[in-house]
Amino acid sequence: MKIRTSFPYETDHEDVRIPLADGTTLYARVWRPLTDIPVPALLEYSPHRLTDWTAPRDWQRHPWYAGHGYASVRVDARGHGNSEGLPGDPYAEAEPADGAEVIDWLAGRPWCDGRVGMIGLGRDGSTALRTAALAPEPLKAVVAVCSTDDPYDGDAHYLGGSVLATGMHSRAATMLAFAARPPDPLYVGDAWRDMWLTRLEGMEPLVHTWLAHQTRDDYWRRGGVREDYGAIRAAVLAVGGRHDPYRDTVLRLVEHLPGDRVRGIIGPWSHQYPDRGLPGPAIGFLQETLRWWDHHLKGEPTGIMSEPLLRSWISASHAPAAGHPELPGRWVGDGTWPSPNVTPVTYALQGPPVLVRSPQHTGLDAGRLVPSGDDAGLPPDQRAEDAHSACFDFPVPPDGAPVEILGRPRVTLALRSDAPAGQVVARLCDVAPDGASTLVTRGALTLSGKEHVFELNGAGHTFPPGHRVRLAVSSAYWPWIWPRPHAAGFTLDPDGSALLLPIRSRTADTVTFEDPEQSEPLGVTVPTTLDDTDTRRPERLIVRDVAQGEWRLETTPRPAGTRHYPDGLELTEESLETYTVQESDPLSPRTRSVWRIRLHRPDMPWNVTIDTRSEIACDATHFLTSDEVICTAGSEVLFHRTWEKRIARTAG
């Protein structure tokens, strides 16, 4: 990583408060070039606390943009960080509406020339898309990274009509803990306590809402832009990663938005900005977005719109591993999407009917739903999962050409089941001559009728000669998929079943990117001790109770531990998620998350702690949720609340 210290403009920054129409003020940090000439503004609008949680990331990029002639602005969302108001539902209308108000406010500043761009990662990129759909006049361009256009089936809540257990639970539990964090008295003064209590009294676990909407209803339709791409008037640069669950958003946006104001990039990365991308190779993401901003906000000829509509990373075959520093492969470009370079090729399944009755712990080697460069975030060798699945192999001839795919594979499966409900999960794997099985992509569908047709997530991969293309079909996938009641597997008939692969013809491509660079880091320090290595909890640990037939997955999200900030803050985060299931009981799954967050300013003194617990279980008719929040200041418990709720299983 190149650290840049010299820029075309000298810069400065200040913290400001942005008023909204309802009287709420939002906390913001503005980096500006030192010039008397008004410049375009760039907005990153996020709930993730600009004075601590995203501060290291913010300092890597906002001063960089300011040094290139932009007012780069980071705003805490309503009810988060040092902003006023109550934390809200990310899929409600308030968040993009607030974003539109902020855009209008920025456009009216004397240092802004009236043109605004908006950028975001994950939820923040999704909010940028939704804000663009409101079409605020000053908003001319958007960069959405690892974001979703479809919060129902293209996010962390449902997959193929089934509850995404690890996504639903982990996100709801994390957001409950994060929403309970207080404002910082260094920035809001003595008002922090009253602001915090008001915030806490207004909290409600989001799992209540998400489990109450188990089908694609109006709640989910309003929460994304997929229902009306035409509402977006700004130019959109959509960016995704092969190991991020939101990568298909890029494919849909480049297909449905006008070609003169959309471009897409899908790299090898997980859920993070591509200049920090793991697996690599990382790219010069800041330079690439600068080309986007300069073209759409300054009218400069950067050549960005002469790039292919979609630039994609196609991975070369590689051994399975839970973490990769860098993957082999190459960049390709397609001028339209769907691309004439991609031809659907059908592979018919062969053999007699096969009974598929996977044990409920099938899926423990799925990897994280949303990996972000963790040591153990990616799927390891799939041989154990394949052993619990019906596998259909298609050899690539040793003396033939490689099979290169780009796009979304599709499966058609003829299934019979005596159970009233169930799921089918399909995985596409690259099997090496030594038997190692590397996961390429996957998908799932709730059972209904006899023929089941569904797409897998988008992939870019090369199967080399001598390898096998494997379709693995299972009836369980915990903890990704929450089992349906009475799920008992199915019979798969290869007659009438097929795998359709999007085969891309090999072209001479010249897609290149600059090497990554950033501005100077903030200087956050992480204290270490000699016994850190011995006491650090594994990121992913699988525990089997042989006598009880019970399996437990324990995960520890990163980062964890204590971080010291230059402004004197000490922030400590510790969390543990557990996913438990009995191998033969579809009603046995349960999830549990515990968080402890401590914010400490020794010089004030200020010392607050947030402890949360979130759990989900089920019976045949209901989901059973339990959540608890305890907040202390010093030794005083300021807030303690428990929520218990039964939610009918209407579809999940």
Predicted feature locations:
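Accessory cap/linker subdomain of secreted extracellular hydrolases
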Residues: 58-59, 67, 133-231
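C-terminal, loop-rich substrate-recognition/catalytic regions characterized by aromatic stacking residues
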Residues: 265, 273-274, 279-632, 636-652
